[in-house]
């Protein structure tokens, strides 16, 4: 859980921020229409939270219980990872992944809109 959150939180969000910072410099005389960007921001962050809490955290908890009861080798075994309850938890990751993906698609749509003009509004 910590690795997924830290990797995306630090490098993914930092990369998105850097892209937006550079794009802001390309259009210094105009303001962005931030509604689409706000939706992208919230969908990406809520999707990451749902993915972590709804899927990755339960996997870690079940693996910890299995490791305490039967050893680390058992918690990392194919039999444990392919068990029915782990399959269900793996499918529970889909809602968070979809939110994250929709947020990223909105971000791409916003960036395309910067080039075509629909994501910009004239400076007042």
Per-region residue spans from a language model:
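Aromatic-anchored segments of alpha-helical transmembrane domains
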Residues: 47-53
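Juxtamembrane membrane-water interface segments of multi-pass membrane proteins
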Residues: 1, 14-42, 53-91, 106-124
